[in-house]
């Protein structure tokens, strides 16, 4: 069990964040059309998994905006923005913001993702949501970079994630 903070208060996180060199766990999440989306849907592409609690928080929204800008510059790479938000909320946010370069995925029917990727917040006011993390995968789903952000209210290290590509 890892521990991060939320505005300085300790929060327990269940599961193990995939480490560099490891094979990423398979997953099934929910896309904007409510269909199941798996890791295999992105076979042959590099993947940036931007994992966060909710797009309705300022830091999470900022991470989606920043990765959207970067995603437009990346060849053979998809940026997956993964949260517990309903697909409707994710679609509404990206539509209102004009964000078209990221793929939103919900843990709505894929709760096992949270523990398999070591981001399941187990205590505190955000229990049941995802901790903030970034996992970068190559075309064969090997982990190139992973970061569990120590303070949930902080942004991830974008430069380190993008440099891993």
Swiss-Prot record:
InterPro entries, per database record: Redoxin (IPR013740), Thioredoxin-like_sf (IPR036249), Thioredoxin_domain (IPR013766), TPX (IPR002065), Tpx_CS (IPR018219), Tpx_Peroxidase_subfamily (IPR050455)
Residues forming the catalytic site: 60
Gene of this entry: tpx
Taxonomic source organism: Pseudomonas aeruginosa (strain ATCC 15692 / DSM 22644 / CIP 104116 / JCM 14847 / LMG 12228 / 1C / PRS 101 / PAO1)
Keyword Calcium (UniProt): no
Function recorded in the entry: Thiol-specific peroxidase that catalyzes the reduction of hydrogen peroxide and organic hydroperoxides to water and alcohols, respectively. Plays a role in cell protection against oxidative stress by detoxifying peroxides.
Pfam families given in the database record: Redoxin (PF08534)
Subunit structure and binding partners: Homodimer.
The protein's Enzyme Commission number: 1.11.1.24
Keywords: Antioxidant, Disulfide bond, Oxidoreductase, Peroxidase, Redox-active center
Keyword hit for Signal: no
Protein name, as recorded: Thiol peroxidase
Family the entry assigns: Belongs to the peroxiredoxin family. Tpx subfamily.
Note: The active site is a conserved redox-active cysteine residue, the peroxidatic cysteine (C(P)), which makes the nucleophilic attack on the peroxide substrate. The peroxide oxidizes the C(P)-SH to cysteine sulfenic acid (C(P)-SOH), which then reacts with another cysteine residue, the resolving cysteine (C(R)), to form a disulfide bridge. The disulfide is subsequently reduced by an appropriate electron donor to complete the catalytic cycle. In this atypical 2-Cys peroxiredoxin, C(R) is present in the same subunit to form an intramolecular disulfide.
Enzyme class: oxidoreductase
């Amino acid at each position: 069990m890892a521990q991060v903070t939320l505005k300085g208060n300790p929060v327990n996180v269940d599961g193990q964040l995939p480490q560099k060199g490891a094979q990423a766990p398979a997953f099934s999440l929910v896309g904007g059309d409510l269909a199941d989306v798996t890791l295999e849907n992105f076979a042959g592409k590099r993947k940036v998994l931007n994992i966060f609690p909710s797009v309705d928080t300022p830091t999470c929204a900022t991470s989606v905006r920043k990765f959207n800008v970067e995603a437009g510059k990346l060849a053979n790479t998809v940026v997956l923005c993964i949260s517990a938000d309903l697909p409707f909320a994710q679609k509404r946010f990206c539509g209102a913001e004009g964000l078209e370069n990221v793929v939103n995925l919900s843990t709505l029917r894929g709760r096992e993702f949270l523990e398999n990727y070591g981001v399941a917040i187990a205590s505190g006011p955000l229990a049941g949501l995802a901790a903030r993390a970034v996992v970068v995968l190559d075309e064969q789903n090997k982990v190139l970079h992973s970061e569990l952000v120590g303070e949930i209210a902080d942004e991830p290290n974008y430069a380190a994630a993008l440099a891993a590509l």
